[in-house]
């Protein structure tokens, strides 16, 4: 479960600060039961392990503040116009791909084409993205272009205007699902047919990124080595090399105790086996994902695309639902089965979202008396 705080009560969220030095190699353990897929493209990848491996070069287009709201200063800036039903993306002129070519408007449009073209078999296409005018028609093969993507200065310009059918409240926040937040190198991939893209070496072995690091070597399914991207728009990064290598969950404890890697992800279940390790800084990584209890109070009408409430459903009784919530000793379960690393949140919107979090909501703690009432 996620925390309603932006920090964990038992852990720091950063390592001790020291003077930054240039150079040095960092080894990172990627914990997984299976080899990573190696699809190094946001529009085609659906594997969390691939995302973890390519994070060193794969930078989001838009900068955000600590509540995930879009702000200026990223590879591109975004401006939402609710009245015009548009989002205007302005690309930073300093941004270049790792081969030295500039990031341009067509690269952003091309990302949408990869997602929506059925030949790519991308799993990123959603009804939320289809809120973009013309994306559904392109997806269905009724149009060869996406009418809702406008490039005022042409394909090689740095401005893109997205036209939407409807505006949504979450469009000012990263991860809203209605606005794609990555680009794809059209100049590099345009000669690869859409149906061959996912298996191409330009995706699997020699991908391009505009982030701080670029790929230097891929051992398929096992490791990826990264070196500084000399074209990075924010300047040369400090590390000389980063190597991300796969290890199995069973190997985590021993690798930490033997200092085999500089950085290792540790799951809650592994904590009892490694909490006594010496010479290691443990820091908290609080995700935005959480688990919740749901009640069946109706059914999904696929034809209408909507939920239909059933007033006679057993669980369509607020008092009954509250009684169940008060009768669940969640804190004790977490203490017993997650070493106290998991904990409750009082509301669906955690504190990380700033003003959107309602600090007055207390949630449901274990309280048999209230449950019986």
Model-derived features with residue positions:
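Short, low-complexity disordered leader/linker segments with a strong preference
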Residues: 1-25
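A bilobed periplasmic-binding-protein/Venus flytrap-type ligand-binding module shared by bacterial periplasmic
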Residues: 227-232, 289-319, 336
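Gly/Pro-rich hinge or "lid" segments in bacterial periplasmic/extracellular proteins
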Residues: 175-237, 241
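N-terminal lobe/hinge region of extracytoplasmic solute-binding protein
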Residues: 29-82, 208
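Ligand-site clamp/hinge motif
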Residues: 201-204, 229-274
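Aromatic- and charge-enriched surface segment that lines or borders ligand/interaction sites
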Residues: 76-128, 313-315
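Surface-exposed binding/hinge segments that line
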Residues: 125-191
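Structural transition elements
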Residues: 343-373
């Amino acid at each position: 479960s996620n925390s309603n705080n932006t920090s964990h009560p038992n852990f720091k969220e950063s390592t001790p600060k020291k003077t930054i030095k240039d150079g040095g190699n960092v080894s990172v353990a990627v914990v997984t039961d299976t080899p990573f897929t190696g699809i190094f493209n946001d529009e085609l990848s659906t594997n969390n392990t691939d995302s973890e491996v390519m994070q060193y070069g794969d930078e989001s287009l838009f900068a955000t503040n600590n509540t995930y709201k879009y702000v200026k200063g990223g590879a591109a800036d975004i401006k939402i116009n609710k009245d015009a039903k548009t989002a205007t993306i302005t690309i930073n002129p300093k941004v270049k791909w790792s081969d030295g070519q500039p990031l341009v408007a067509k690269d952003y449009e091309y990302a949408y084409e990869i997602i929506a073209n059925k030949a790519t078999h991308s799993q990123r296409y959603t009804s939320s993205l289809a809120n973009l005018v013309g994306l559904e028609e392109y997806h269905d093969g009724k149009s060869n272009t996406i009418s809702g993507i406008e490039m005022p200065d042409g394909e090689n310009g740095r401005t893109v205007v997205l036209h939407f059918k409807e505006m949504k409240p979450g469009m000012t926040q990263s991860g809203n699902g209605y606005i794609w937040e990555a680009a794809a190198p059209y100049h590099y991939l345009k000669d690869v047919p859409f149906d061959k893209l996912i298996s191409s070496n330009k995706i699997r072995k020699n991908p391009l990124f505009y982030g701080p690091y670029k790929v230097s070597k891929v051992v398929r399914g096992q490791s990826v080595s990264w070196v500084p991207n000399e074209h990075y728009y924010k300047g040369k990064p400090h590390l000389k090399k980063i190597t991300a290598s796969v290890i199995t969950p069973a190997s985590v404890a021993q690798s930490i105790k033997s200092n085999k890697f500089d950085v290792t992800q540790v799951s809650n279940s592994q904590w009892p086996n490694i909490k006594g390790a010496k010479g290691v800084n443990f820091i908290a990584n609080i995700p935005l994902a959480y688990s919740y209890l749901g009640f069946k109070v109706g059914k999904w009408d696929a034809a209408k695309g909507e939920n239909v409430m059933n007033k006679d459903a057993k669980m369509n009784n607020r008092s009954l639902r509250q009684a169940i919530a008060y009768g669940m000793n969640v804190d004790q379960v977490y203490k017993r089965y997650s070493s106290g690393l998991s904990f409750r949140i009082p509301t669906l919107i955690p504190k990380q979202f700033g003003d959107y979090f309602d600090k007055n909501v207390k949630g449901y703690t274990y309280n048999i008396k209230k449950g019986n009432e």
